[in-house]
Amino acid sequence: MLKWIVRGVAALLALFLLYQLWIFGHIVYWKWNNPATTAFMDEQQARLAETNPDAELRYRWVDYGRISPQLKRAIVASEDAKFLQHEGFDWEGIQTAWEKNLQKGRIVAGGSTISQQLAKNLFLSSRRTPWRKAEEALITVMLEAVMDKRRIFEIYLNVIEWGDGVFGAESAARHYYRVPASRLSAGQAAKLAAMVPNPRYYDTHRNDRTLLRKTKIIQRRMNFVAIP
């Protein structure tokens, strides 16, 4: 009996390690090649297909140099002001988010860095479970070990959700403002950054008071952050 238990545990461990190697292999490949899709994109494609089998995501990759510096600053100011300083985890930000959530009695702040958000988007589902958070941490370590900050940020800007079926800076710029990502103004960039936490809602509530208030805050902060 004990022998079978040991074999079962060994088999599970082997599968776990193989899965991590599969993820690591993709990260190494994406260091030089652009992702065609992500786990989160696939999840949203399936959701849209439930009501419209012909639905397609709006996703267009653009190189880092073709994305407005205004948007880069706005995203860092909004999502991860210490992006260039940490190695994947902002422990002070995590503690602050934890305290806010305890105070409110519900999840109102995440504390996830740009690297953590990218890890989740590339490989994981949107379900919140302890396993997913642990796997997200492992993937974040891999991303930071393999890629430099510029590449992490380039992929992030191209794959995050910015509306219902809208992914990446280029598609978002054209969807909301009918301009390429390279031509976004400071105000437009700040508003796009403010939408990131809840993009599908803000896609249909573009004059929401909370969104407009956060946009102004980001505009005040964005010129004081460093970007890759």
Swiss-Prot record:
Main subcellular location: membrane
GO molecular function per UniProt: pentosyltransferase activity; peptidoglycan glycosyltransferase activity
EC code(s) of this entry: 2.4.99.28
Compartments, as annotated in UniProt: Cell inner membrane
An annotated GO cellular component: plasma membrane
Membrane topology reported for the UniProt record: Single-pass membrane protein
Keywords carried by this UniProt record: Cell inner membrane, Cell membrane, Cell shape, Cell wall biogenesis/degradation, Glycosyltransferase, Membrane, Peptidoglycan synthesis, Transferase, Transmembrane, Transmembrane helix
Pathway(s) of this molecule: Cell wall biogenesis; peptidoglycan biosynthesis
Pfam families: Transgly
Alphabetical list of InterPro entries matching this protein: Glyco_trans_51, Lysozyme-like_dom_sf, PBP_transglycosylase, Pep_trsgly
Annotated TM spans: 8-28
Top-rank taxon, per record: Bacteria
Top-level EC class: transferase
Chemical reaction(s) catalysed: [GlcNAc-(1->4)-Mur2Ac(oyl-L-Ala-gamma-D-Glu-L-Lys-D-Ala-D-Ala)](n)-di-trans,octa-cis-undecaprenyl diphosphate + beta-D-GlcNAc-(1->4)-Mur2Ac(oyl-L-Ala-gamma-D-Glu-L-Lys-D-Ala-D-Ala)-di-trans,octa-cis-undecaprenyl diphosphate = [GlcNAc-(1->4)-Mur2Ac(oyl-L-Ala-gamma-D-Glu-L-Lys-D-Ala-D-Ala)](n+1)-di-trans,octa-cis-undecaprenyl diphosphate + di-trans,octa-cis-undecaprenyl diphosphate + H(+)
Alphabetical list of SUPFAM superfamilies matching this protein: Lysozyme-like
Record-level GO BP terms: cell wall organization; peptidoglycan biosynthetic process; regulation of cell shape
Family listed: Belongs to the glycosyltransferase 51 family.
Function as written in the Swiss-Prot or TrEMBL entry: Peptidoglycan polymerase that catalyzes glycan chain elongation from lipid-linked precursors.
Protein name as annotated: Biosynthetic peptidoglycan transglycosylase
Organism field: Laribacter hongkongensis (strain HLHK9)
Record gene name: mtgA
